[in-house]
From Swiss-Prot:
<keyword id="KW-0547">Nucleotide-binding</keyword>
<dbReference type="GO" id="GO:0044374">
    <property type="term" value="F:sequence-specific DNA binding, bending"/>
</dbReference>
<comment type="subunit">
    <text>Homodimer. Heterotrimer of two small and one large terminase subunits. The catalytically competent terminase is composed of a tetramer of heterotrimers. The tetramer forms a ring structure large enough to encircle duplex DNA. Host IHFA/IHFB induces bending of viral DNA to facilitate the assembly of the terminase tetramer of heterotrimers. Interacts (via C-terminus) with the terminase large subunit (via N-terminus).</text>
</comment>
<dbReference type="GO" id="GO:0097710">
    <property type="term" value="C:viral terminase, small subunit"/>
</dbReference>
<keyword id="KW-0378">Hydrolase</keyword>
<feature type="coiled-coil region">
    <location>
        <begin position="52"/>
        <end position="109"/>
    </location>
</feature>
<feature type="region of interest" description="Self-assembly">
    <location>
        <begin position="110"/>
        <end position="140"/>
    </location>
</feature>
<dbReference type="GO" id="GO:0030430">
    <property type="term" value="C:host cell cytoplasm"/>
</dbReference>
<keyword id="KW-0231">Viral genome packaging</keyword>
<comment type="function">
    <text>The small subunit is responsible for the binding to multiple recognition elements within the packaging initiation site cos. The terminase lies at a unique vertex of the procapsid and is composed of two subunits, a small terminase subunit involved in viral DNA recognition (binding to packaging sequence cos), and a large terminase subunit possessing endonucleolytic and ATPase activities (DNA maturation and packaging). The terminase binds, cooperatively with the host factor IHFA/IHFB, to the cos site at the junction of adjacent viral genomes in the concatemeric DNA.</text>
</comment>
<dbReference type="GO" id="GO:0016887">
    <property type="term" value="F:ATP hydrolysis activity"/>
</dbReference>
<feature type="region of interest" description="Winged helix-turn-helix (wHTH)">
    <location>
        <begin position="1"/>
        <end position="29"/>
    </location>
</feature>
<feature type="binding site">
    <location>
        <begin position="31"/>
        <end position="36"/>
    </location>
    <ligand>
        <name>ATP</name>
    </ligand>
</feature>
<feature type="region of interest" description="Binding to terminase large subunit">
    <location>
        <begin position="141"/>
        <end position="180"/>
    </location>
</feature>
<keyword id="KW-0238">DNA-binding</keyword>
<dbReference type="GO" id="GO:0019073">
    <property type="term" value="P:viral DNA genome packaging"/>
</dbReference>
<dbReference type="InterPro" id="IPR010906">
    <property type="entry name" value="Phage_lambda_Nu1_terminase-ssu"/>
</dbReference>
Amino acid sequence: MEVNKKQLADIFGASIRTIQNWQEQGMPVLRGGGKGNEVLYDSAAVIKWYAERDAEIENEKLRREVEELRQASEADLQPGTIEYERHRLTRAQADAQELKNARDSAEVVETAFCTFVLSRIAGEIASILDGLPLSVQRRFPELENRHVDFLKRDIIKAMNKAAALDELIPGLLSEYIEQSG
């Protein structure tokens, strides 16, 4: 939705000056600006920018907290003390936020999602392969049955591999982690 500076300020409950400051900080402008031209914004793009900016600010705060705690020297922290527990909590929060950001930006995805997608694609491929011998037989009627049967056998092997993909992924993931780690 296109909005002007005043409408955007109302949406965020902020002043027009704040909107101007955000614009200087990189908030996306749809069009306009310059001498005498009203600036228009795409509200969805601005909300996305604001959320990303807010997450970056929060990450920076957590990073600073972690760094302050590290400077306090991890060796000096005694298990069971408030400082030690605060250090563990802050580090866990920072790690969780970084993982969430990586997931939100699609830098990482869950294994279950990959298994789901690959299994669905494998099923579609198996369906196409299943009709291939009949298509070849119709297209080339001069082929003997032994040729078509040979084709069917190899296609069945490929279909079985595709069908077992969802069972193979966890093992392949473990193998990948072992080799890359």
